[in-house]
């Protein structure tokens, strides 16, 4: 009883506790200034105290709100009238509520609102009228609600909303119009545009959906396009004509117009609308015809018809009504008036006159100025001046003239220009004590004055603030109290323009570690977190490095925002020292820790499946490879993908064996993984499987052995120091004598950043959702089609097309990824082209989005690059799972490997054995010049000879020479350059044998390639900024790995694709088009026969240096030749080069673009607007946002291509960083770099620096006689071209060996690295050595052999010297004695015909033995050669491995599956 009594007492007290002296309405609750009258069945507005601030009348039966119902409640800020029965709100119902903020009218029965309903509610912020019966609104209804932030009109019956209904609601933040019956026709288009503007600027949330028409039902109004609104602005179909009428007659002016909605016809007389109500003589018919009855003299003048609807308006030409009377001189009906007009707008000086006959109107300007006929147009109603400029300022005179007289009237055009900013300041963040300078400039008429304010007031009197006469605000030494908002104002009599900027002043703070990482250990297969935190100003970015390679986000590694490194599924490769780097714009701090990975003893889950999985993997991989070979080489290719696969398929058996072993190794792990998952009782679907706890290290080593990974080529033998001190090995080994495989062919690409695979090991980005992302990566084909546009090519104003083609030629010297050996999936052998599943090696590109080619295929063929065994590490044992790496077939160095091959086997195939002069093989001579073409390849001709009349492929150091006519021409040029060099060197040194000539010529050609690249080509690409970053040569650094970086080969160096022109120009000697014409890019592919049949190499080369390059415009990055028509000359389905590059980057685990920005010390990226410094075009950033969703997912290549070019370069900031990094490594890590002291003599180096591509063209073109000095620079023909005789040459005389009597002939000694003391037989092949040694014994006694040892001999003629003969003879005798000793040693070595194997066991000549179960070895010519046996598919379902046999055994017969009895 007591609690109930207390409650009633409390309510009573509340009811009475209102404002002193003012009554609380009966049954209402009052508390201070709040009055609540709810659930009282009220049917009227009660009287409440005047000081009320909150009035709550909800849940009553109020039906009407009368006028001035709340007039005395000046303090009311909240009025709740919802949940009543209100049907009518009188005009001025809310009069006097100037302070009302919140008005609730929802859930009533309101059908209409008067346009004065909300008049005076100037402070209202929230208005809720939803859930009513509103059927229409008036444009002025919300006109006074300037501060309104929320307007809820949903769940009414609105079908139409008049234009301009929300035009004054500048503070609006939320607008709801959904759940109405909106008809989305032309009348509602204004609302769609308004809502689209809300969405674009982001300051207002709005909702509105279409109910009608049916086709738009449920669509958001903001999403409806202009075309879908089906609007048609008025179009005049019949215009009124001039008429002359006597007094009292009736006149008809006809006007017809069409439009949707039907336009309203309005008539204008002498620039004033006709008022039909005031003059009963006037009438407008339904068809728009104007009738004037009982005409008067006042009716004469100009009539104009205007048709208007919601989509726009249209006016007819003026029609004249002339009142017929007695002859009269002219008199003005309308005179021109002085007009003030803003610059850039248009205006009309109206001038019309009457008279009889009708007067002629003409115009003149004061001061004798003529009218501008292009902008000043005389019409029947006046003078129309369009696009007003400052020159239009002045006086214009209208002349009306007839036979009875002339009248004139003049008016002034006063041109005014309000202030407009020409330079606007930007927000700045600076360190204290740094200077700040804001530029602010404006134009206008009258000229505006620049005024600066701070936080709305004057600039501080104290401090270092200075406003220059130009309007620039300068703060000399910024301090903390200087930060805040500044405003630049451009002030003139026409108005004020303002722009605000924010200054943030931060104290200096370098990065400092707040938590250091500690040495720790982790078990194999476990995850581990390593903390590293730092602070600074700005907040430093934390990155982690391992062994000099930056760690990036992937399925293997994760670095959170605070800097903690997480390593998933730790393995032995993860052991080592890690660096934590804290970097901000003022510096960096580095600390490190050591991670130890400990092994888990015992068997792993996958060990039981090793034997069966390896057998299945061998069978599946071999079967798929054999199937692919049959498909590619037993017939001509059917598709462009077949052509590409055949063209790039490895020819070298060693490459095939290495790639096969890598595929077997990976596929075995995949099979084990699948079988372990099948045996688990826990469902792991959707979770990444962990590799390092899959199988034990012992089982991994077994898999590596059985797959062939450990049977790779032996480590290079660099013991022959005499050869390796002077010449390069063809395969690039032994360049770095401490790390012999650095930069060598058939090694894994290098990395700047750790690979970004989805599972951390092998799964590419693009399979499923990216790590930490909410949406999948866009299909590469979609990305490519966004950037590919068919547009006119913009020519480069500085450079020629040779710039791109030299890069293409150079790229083939540096890298060539080993492709997939199979284009059929391993699981069931089905071709990748017939399935669209990500089943190794298939990694197809989805094309389900709209494809411009119109193909219905759901995907495009793509097969992953072949993996390197154990990431290409040279270790003989494999005890852990490494991240997938790819193999580079080429040597990394700029050494002409695309001319000479990247292996000893290739180089031998290219040399001409018939001529012992160190020449390369030649093809038949080109008839006009007699210079040879490249020889034809003896392999399968199907890539090039697709038709019987076509020639086979050319034979060159790189098979890709046949890929394009320009490449074939460049290869022809350089093979001729070698033979030219070899011929001249042989003539200068007739005592040199063939191999010495070959090696010396090869060495010179390599130096020319280096010099042209770094001195002529790179400065054009990198400009002065990049050249400074690259810095000058400082000597060889053996600690630099010159290997090609994966991201450089896969993405950065593919920048040339954006420079490819869709047309290959072919020019004659005067740079005109040849008779055979130019070629589309795709028709120049795989067509070397065009060189033979259509003019040789000169027309192609002239098209490279005689035509401007393509300018890289972000709006037209790629030609459709590359994305839609590549290889379509021969096949119906083309290949998309751009999409392939993007997919290849994901295949290779190339990290996203933002990770490389961090590596290159650019600003970090959290959202797309953070890219505005490097990608200024907002439209491009919007495209990236639409494609990727998150900046952290952007692929490297497309981002590099859309970066803004650094002025004076052809690259953006990140691409510049990658270029400089790679080319520094290529130069500094090359022991044979041409500028490295000792590689060439100073005299030779001086001559090599005379080399130029222009000279090479002159010397080796078919018949090129004129060329510009620098073929990369655009030049005008003929004035900027030089005769070839004016181009500097490399003088080879400094390579001439000097004889013993050179001093008497006045000659000088000049031989590469003292080669005059070394016998060239050491660098010979076996045939050359045998020939040289046999000659050695039969030399006549009058010859003398001088040298350091028996392997280095130079033949000198015996002569007598007139001076110092005794000393010379003593030296000769001493040398002969040493020579005999060396000859005896050589002969003893030649008599030893045996070998020594890797275990130190002596072997006899021709002896054969088994090194391992699958490895056969033989001793031949003193050298051990081992071959790994390839097993055929087993004919039984469950073959087994038996110790002592190589291939699986079928138990049912107890014999190997490949034994002859089973065939």
From Swiss-Prot:
Heme b binds at residue 1057. Glycans are attached at residue 387. It comes from the Eukaryota. Induction: Increased by Angiotensin-2. Probable oxidoreductase. Lacks peroxidase activity. Inhibits the peroxidase activity of PXDN through its interaction. It is found in: Secreted; Endoplasmic reticulum; Cell membrane. Its cofactor is heme b. This is Probable oxidoreductase PXDNL. One of its GO terms (biological process) is hydrogen peroxide catabolic process. PANTHER family: OXIDASE/PEROXIDASE, OXIDOREDUCTASE PXDNL-RELATED. Residues 24-50 form the LRRNT domain. Residues 1-23 form the signal peptide. Phosphorylation by SRC on tyrosine residues is required for targeting to polysomes. GO terms for cellular component: endoplasmic reticulum; extracellular space; plasma membrane.
């Amino acid at each position: 009883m007591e609690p109930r009594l207390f409650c009633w007492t409390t309510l009573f007290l509340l009811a009475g506790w209102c404002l002193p002296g003012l009554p609380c309405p009966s049954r209402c609750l009052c508390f201070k200034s709040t009055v609540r009258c709810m659930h009282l069945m009220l049917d009227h507005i009660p009287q409440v105290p005047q000081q009320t601030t909150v009035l709550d009348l909800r849940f009553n039966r109020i039906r009407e709100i009368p006028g001035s119902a709340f007039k005395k409640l000046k303090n009311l800020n909240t009025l709740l009238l919802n949940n009543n029965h209100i049907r009518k709100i009188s005009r001025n119902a809310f009069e006097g509520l100037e302070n009302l903020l919140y008005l609730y009218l929802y859930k009533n029965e309101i059908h209409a609102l008067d346009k004065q309903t909300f008049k005076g509610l100037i402070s209202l912020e929230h208005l809720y009228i939803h859930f009513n019966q509103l059927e229409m609104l008036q444009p002025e209804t919300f006109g006074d609600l300037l501060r309104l932030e929320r307007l809820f009109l949903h769940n009414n019956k609105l079908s139409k909303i008049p234009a301009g209904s929300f035009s004054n609601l500048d503070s609006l933040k939320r607008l709801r119009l959904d759940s109405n019956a909106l008809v989305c026709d032309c009348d509602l288009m204004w609302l769609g545009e308004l809502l689209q503007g809300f969405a674009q600027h982001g300051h207002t949330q709005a909702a509105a959906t279409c109910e009608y028409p049916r086709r738009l039902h449920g669509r958001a109004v903001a999403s409806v396009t202009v075309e879908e609104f089906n609007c048609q602005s008025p179009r005049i179909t019949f215009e009124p004509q001039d008429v002359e009428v006597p007094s009292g007659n009736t006149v008809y002016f006809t006007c017809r117009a069409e439009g949707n909605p039907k336009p309203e016809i309005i008539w204008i007389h002498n620039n004033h609308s006709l008022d039909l109500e005031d003059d009963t003589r006037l009438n407008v018919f339904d068809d728009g015809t104007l009738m004037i009855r009982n005409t008067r003299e006042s009716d004469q003048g100009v009539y104009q018809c205007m048709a208007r609807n919601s989509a726009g308006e249209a006016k007819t030409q003026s029609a004249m009504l002339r009142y017929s009377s007695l002859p009269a001189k002219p008199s003005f009906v309308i005179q021109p008036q002085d007009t003030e007009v803003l610059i850039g707008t248009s205006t009309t000086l109206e001038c019309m006159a009457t008279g009889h006959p009708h007067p002629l109107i003409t115009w003149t300007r004061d001061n004798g100025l003529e009218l501008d006929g292009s902008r000043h147009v005389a019409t029947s109603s006046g003078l129309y001046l369009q696009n007003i400029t400052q020159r239009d300022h002045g006086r214009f005179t209208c002349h009306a003239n007839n036979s009875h007289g002339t009248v004139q009237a003049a008016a002034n055009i006063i041109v005014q220009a309000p202030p407009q900013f020409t330079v606007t300041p930007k927000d700045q963040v600076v360190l204290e004590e740094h200077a700040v300078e804001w530029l602010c400039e404006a134009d206008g008429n009258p000229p505006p004055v620049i005024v600066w304010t701070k936080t709305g007031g004057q600039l501080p009197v104290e401090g270092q603030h200075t406003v220059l006469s130009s309007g620039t605000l300068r703060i000399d030494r910024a301090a903390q109290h200087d930060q805040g908002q500044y405003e630049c104002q451009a002030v003139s009599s026409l108005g004020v323009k303002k722009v605000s900027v924010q200054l943030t002043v931060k104290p200096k703070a370098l990065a400092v570690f707040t938590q250091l990482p500690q040495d720790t250990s982790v078990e194999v297969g476990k995850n581990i977190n390593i903390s590293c935190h730092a602070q600074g100003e700005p907040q430093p970015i934390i990155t982690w490095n391992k062994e000099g390679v930056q760690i990036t986000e992937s399925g293997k590694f994760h670095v959170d925002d605070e800097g903690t490194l997480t390593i998933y599924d730790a393995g032995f490769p993860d052991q080592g020292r890690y660096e934590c780097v804290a970097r901000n714009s003022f510096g960096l701090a580095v600390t490190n820790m050591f991670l130890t990975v400990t092994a888990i003893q015992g068997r792993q889950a996958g060990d039981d499946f090793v034997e069966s999985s390896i057998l299945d993997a061998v069978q599946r991989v071999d079967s798929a490879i054999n199937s692919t070979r049959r498909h590619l080489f037993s017939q001509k290719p059917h598709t462009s993908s077949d052509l590409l696969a055949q063209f790039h398929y490895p020819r070298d058996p060693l490459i095939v064996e290495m790639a096969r072993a890598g595929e077997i190794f990976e596929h075995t792990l995949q099979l084990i993984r699948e079988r372990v998952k099948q045996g688990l009782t826990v469902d792991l679907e959707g979770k990444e499987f962990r590799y390092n706890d899959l199988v034990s290290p012992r089982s991994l080593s077994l898999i590596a052995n059985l797959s062939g990974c450990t049977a790779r080529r032996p480590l290079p033998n660099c013991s022959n120091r005499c050869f390796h001190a002077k010449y390069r090995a063809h395969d690039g080994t032994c360049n770095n004598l401490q790390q012999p495989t650095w930069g060598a062919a058939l090694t894994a690409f290098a990395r700047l950043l750790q690979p970004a695979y989805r599972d951390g090991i092998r799964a590419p980005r693009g399979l499923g959702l990216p790590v930490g992302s909410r949406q999948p990566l866009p299909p590469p084909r979609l990305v490519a089609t966004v950037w590919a546009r068919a547009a006119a090519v913009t020519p480069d104003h500085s450079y020629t097309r040779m710039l791109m083609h030299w890069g293409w030629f150079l790229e083939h010297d540096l890298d060539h990824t080993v492709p997939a050996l199979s284009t059929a999936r391993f699981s069931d052998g089905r071709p990748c082209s017939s399935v669209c599943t990500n089943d190794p090696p298939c990694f197809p590109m989805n094309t389900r989005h709209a494809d411009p080619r119109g193909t219905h295929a759901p995907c495009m063929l793509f097969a992953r690059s072949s993996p390197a065994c154990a990431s290409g590490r040279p270790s003989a044992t494999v005890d852990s799972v490494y991240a997938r790496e790819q193999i580079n077939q080429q040597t990394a160095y700029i050494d002409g490997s695309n001319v000479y091959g990247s292996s000893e086997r290739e180089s031998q195939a290219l040399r001409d054995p018939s001529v012992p002069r160190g020449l390369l093989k030649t093809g038949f001579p080109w008839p006009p010049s007699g210079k040879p073409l490249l020889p034809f390849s003896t392999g399968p001709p199907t890539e090039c000879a697709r038709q019987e009349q076509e020639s086979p492929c050319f034979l060159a150091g790189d098979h890709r020479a046949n890929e394009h006519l320009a490449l074939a021409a460049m290869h022809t040029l350089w093979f001729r350059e070698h033979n030219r060099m070899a011929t001249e060197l042989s003539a200068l040194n007739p005592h040199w044998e063939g191999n010495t000539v070959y090696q010396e010529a090869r060495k010179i050609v390599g130096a020319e390639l280096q010099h042209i690249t770094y001195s002529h080509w790179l400065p054009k690409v990198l400009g002065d900024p990049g050249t400074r970053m690259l810095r000058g040569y400082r000597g060889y650094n053996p600690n630099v790995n010159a290997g090609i970086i994966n991201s450089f080969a896969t993405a950065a160096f593919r920048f040339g694709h954006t420079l490819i022109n869709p047309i290959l120009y072919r020019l004659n000697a005067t740079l005109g088009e040849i008779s055979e014409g130019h070629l589309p890019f795709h028709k120049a592919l795989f067509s070397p026969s065009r060189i033979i049949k259509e003019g040789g190499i000169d027309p192609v080369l002239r098209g490279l240096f005689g035509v401007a390059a393509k300018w890289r415009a972000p709006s037209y990055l790629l030609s459709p030749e590359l994305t839609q028509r590549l290889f379509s000359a021969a096949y119906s389905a083309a290949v998309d080069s751009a999409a392939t590059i993007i997919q290849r980057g994901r295949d290779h685990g190339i990290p996203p673009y933002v990770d490389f920005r961090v590596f290159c010390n650019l600003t970090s990226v959290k959202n797309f607007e953070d890219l505005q410094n490097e990608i200024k075009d907002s439209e491009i950033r919007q495209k990236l946002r639409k494609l990727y969703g998150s900046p952290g997912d952007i692929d490297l290549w497309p981002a590099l291509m859309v970066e803004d070019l650094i002025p004076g370069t052809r690259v953006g900031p990140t691409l510049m960083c990658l270029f400089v990094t790679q080319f520094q490594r290529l130069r500094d890590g090359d022991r044979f770099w041409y500028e490295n002291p000792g590689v060439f003599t100073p005299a030779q180096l001086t001559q090599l620096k005379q080399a130029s591509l222009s000279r090479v063209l002159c010397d080796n073109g078919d018949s090129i006689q004129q060329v510009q000095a620098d073929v990369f620079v655009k030049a005008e023909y003929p004035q900027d071209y030089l005769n070839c005789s004016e181009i500097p040459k490399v003088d080879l005389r400094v390579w001439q060996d000097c004889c013993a009597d050179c001093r008497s002939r006045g000659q000088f000694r000049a031989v590469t690295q003292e080669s005059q003391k070394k016998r060239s037989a050491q660098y010979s092949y076996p045939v050359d050595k045998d020939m040289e040694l046999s000659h050695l014994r039969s030399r006549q006694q009058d010859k003398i052999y001088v040298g350091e040892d028996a392997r280095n001999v130079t033949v000198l003629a015996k002569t007598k010297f007139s001076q110092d003969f005794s000393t010379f003879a003593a030296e000769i005798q001493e040398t002969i004695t040493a020579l005999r000793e060396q000859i005896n040693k050589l002969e003893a070595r030649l008599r030893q015909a045996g070998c020594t194997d890797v275990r130190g066991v002596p072997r006899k000549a021709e002896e054969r033995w088994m090194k391992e179960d699958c490895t056969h070895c033989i001793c031949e010519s003193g050298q051990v050669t081992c071959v790994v046996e390839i097993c055929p598919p087993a004919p039984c379902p469950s073959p087994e491995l038996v110790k002592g046999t190589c291939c699986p055994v079928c138990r049912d017969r107890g014999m190997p599956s490949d034994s002859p009895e089973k065939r």
